[in-house]
């Protein structure tokens, strides 16, 4: 973990703070501009404070290397330690160092995505139903280890389907839904 990795991680944590504030928010790289960050870098523990610019809500994230997790909640704490790992692992709070080599959020390929509301989930499942039979079409799947699933985690709202938005010059905005699949360890 170095200061550059932590700066890139702070942008991802801004997106997680937006989901804590509004679980059904549409996440894109523009969301980062709504937040300011205060990073207190340390070799073993880094404290990242994420403050919303207009509502002044503050969320504090404690970041640890996977070998030295010493977590105790503080004021305005996120509720979970953020752990930098060597490899891709399950868990919404575990980010592999490979995610942090570049500024993923600022990338042109960073997706625009959102969690579906319960009524939207029911609508999607009803559309996938084949007639009156018990058979149903399946959505494309995504692993819970993908960064979009890690960002969309909220303890009170389980994530079932992620909706991705893609701009199309001809048809406007296209949507594609993907169902979340748990990774077996």
From Swiss-Prot:
Keywords: DNA-directed RNA polymerase, Nucleotidyltransferase, Transcription, Transferase, Virion. It is found in: Virion. It comes from the Viruses. It catalyses: RNA(n) + a ribonucleoside 5'-triphosphate = RNA(n+1) + diphosphate. Signal peptide: none annotated. The keyword Transferase applies. Coiled coil: none annotated. GO terms for molecular function: DNA binding; DNA-directed RNA polymerase activity. The keyword Cell wall biogenesis/degradation does not apply. Pfam families: Pox_RNA_Pol_22. GO terms for cellular component: DNA-directed RNA polymerase complex; virion component. GO terms for biological process: viral transcription. Its EC number is 2.7.7.6. The DNA-dependent RNA polymerase used for intermediate and late genes expression consists of eight subunits Rpo30/OPG66, Rpo7/OPG90, Rpo22/OPG103, Rpo147/OPG105, Rpo18/OPG119, Rpo19/OPG131, Rpo132/OPG151 and Rpo35/OPG156. The same holoenzyme, with the addition of the transcription-specificity factor OPG109, is used for early gene expression. Part of the DNA-dependent RNA polymerase which catalyzes the transcription of viral DNA into RNA using the four ribonucleoside triphosphates as substrates. Responsible for the transcription of early, intermediate and late genes. DNA-dependent RNA polymerase associates with the early transcription factor (ETF), itself composed of OPG118 and OPG133, thereby allowing the early genes transcription. Late transcription, and probably also intermediate transcription, require newly synthesized RNA polymerase. Belongs to the poxviridae DNA-directed RNA polymerase 22 kDa subunit family. This is DNA-directed RNA polymerase 21 kDa subunit. It comes from Myxoma virus (strain Lausanne) (MYXV). The gene is OPG103.
């Amino acid at each position: 973990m170095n200061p550059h990795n932590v700066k890139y991680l702070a942008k991802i944590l801004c997106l997680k703070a937006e989901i804590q504030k509004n679980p059904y928010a549409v996440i894109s790289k523009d969301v980062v501009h709504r937040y300011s960050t205060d990073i207190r870098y340390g070799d073993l523990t880094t404290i990242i404070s994420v403050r919303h610019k207009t509502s002044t809500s503050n969320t504090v994230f404690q970041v640890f290397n996977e070998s030295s997790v010493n977590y105790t909640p503080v004021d305005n704490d996120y509720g979970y330690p953020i752990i930098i790992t060597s490899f891709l692992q399950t868990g919404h709070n575990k980010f592999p160092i490979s995610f942090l080599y570049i500024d993923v959020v600022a990338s042109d390929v960073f997706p625009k995505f959102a969690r579906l509301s319960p009524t939207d989930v029911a609508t999607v499942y009803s559309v996938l139903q084949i007639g009156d039979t018990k058979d149903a079409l399946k959505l494309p799947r995504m692993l819970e280890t993908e960064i979009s699933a890690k960002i969309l985690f909220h303890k009170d709202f389980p994530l079932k389907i992620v909706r991705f938005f893609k701009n199309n010059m001809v048809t406007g905005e296209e949507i594609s839904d993907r169902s979340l699949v748990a990774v077996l360890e």
